[in-house]
């Protein structure tokens, strides 16, 4: 079973669909942790209601790579296999992308122009 780590900054609407797909066994995965850089992001509430471990990490007054290293530690703590970016409104550092090479998927609700 794939252990998912979710990074999100917004409502996390797509998280609901992923939870439903897991519950109906359409998706053979487990959401191990949800991390947000926005304290009041509804994605954290979705995680709480569904009893998914969740963390808030502020990105303010911190260099991008240091922020990414804090996220990295949490993802390792939960033995994450694959990261889903669901409305994550931060640009990830080159370092983070190398560490998680081919293990990051960006979920975007529409086509970009």
Identify the meaning behind each predicted range.
Residues 1-113:
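One-carbon transfer enzymes
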